[in-house]
């Protein structure tokens, strides 16, 4: 399976379990520098009052299946959208995501 197909399958799977989530691809895959052993880095921003472990597992579960099927490691970070958008300061990580991230 090609990496672009993996990213498309990730997008479709996540939109099924979290239809209003914003999914941002970042890292080597977003920069077009991914190697065969590179992981796929994601930030998943959700519009929930709070983020529970149960809801996180509901979102992540389909990604485990895709990892097994594709052999590519998927590294998701789930955050509340309001916290991401209203953080009090920028970090090197957040600037990196904003500069190179691709919304899926």
Model-inferred region functions:
Residues 40-45:
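Short beta-strand->loop micro-motif that forms the acidic, two-metal-ion catalytic signature
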């Amino acid at each position: 399976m090609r990496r672009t197909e993996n990213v498309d399958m990730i997008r479709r799977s996540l939109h099924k379990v979290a239809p209003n989530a914003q999914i941002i691809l970042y890292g080597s895959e977003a920069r077009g520098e991914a190697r065969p052993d590179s992981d796929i880095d994601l930030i998943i921003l959700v519009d929930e009052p709070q983020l529970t472990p149960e809801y996180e597992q509901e979102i992540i579960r389909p990604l485990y299946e895709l990892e097994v099927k594709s052999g590519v490691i998927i590294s998701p970070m789930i955050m509340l959208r309001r916290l991401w958008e209203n953080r009090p300061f920028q970090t090197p990580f957040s600037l990196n995501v904003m500069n190179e991230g691709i919304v899926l």
